[in-house]
Amino acid sequence: MSIQDQVRRELAEFTDAESRVARALLGEYPMAGMETVARLARRAETSGPTILRFVARLGFDNYAAFQDAIRSEIQARLQSPLVRYDSIATKSAEADTTDRVAQALRRNIEIAAQDLRKDIGRITALLTDLDRTVLCLGGRFSGMIAAYLYQYLRELRPGVRLVRDGTAAWADYLLDVREGDILVVFDFRRYQRDVLEFARSAAAQKAVIVLVTDIWYSPIAAISDVVVACPVSIPSAFDSGVTGLAMVELMTAGAVEALGPRSKARIATLEALRKPFNLSP
């Protein structure tokens, strides 16, 4: 579990002063955690001893150990496929690649599904509120996962948009964002500045931000209303997108159940409209 994840999970248990530290840390994570004790205390409008009590409560012997853990997270966040090649090359040649990867995929999905459980009710309520527009956004690779969610949702309900066409046109999508609209954004490590800036702009327009990210947390987590964390590591030079796709399947299943006859009627209408375009009977 990342420090950010731990702080989020324990937020309700902190004292008032510790909660100010937690919010300051989450608001500019991980860089706030790399500041001096004095500077973080000023950011949180509290004292140095409160900062030290806060990191002790997280399980660290001292502030230096706390910062070492954050450095390790940052290093893991920024790993490129080229770096991961070295670790993959050390695996036993006798080990079965299919088994190792399949086991990792199963484990990742189980962990992410458990994390989603606490928020699935809220996510379902948001995605099935027909008074809200839903925007789906992803990055260079995660854009395909955003498109996957979009393809499902547009059959279930009106008012769903996929943010695409290149960043030069992204402002056009922001133009009509209203308070309460939803941005479902997929952002995984080697996070993209353009995706972050779009999310910030949507949040500034009071959109609800639902973030699907990895266990190291995209910077978008600091402005998100709901965060779903997906393990993505597998025995490969590349991170896996399967867990993100599985979260889309789970969210879609929840939406289907919640919308019930309304989505069924919409799909029936769509199927009738498609008939003239189908080659097969």
Where are these regions (language model features)?
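Residue-level recognition of specific faces of alpha-helices
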Residues: 3, 54, 62, 69, ...
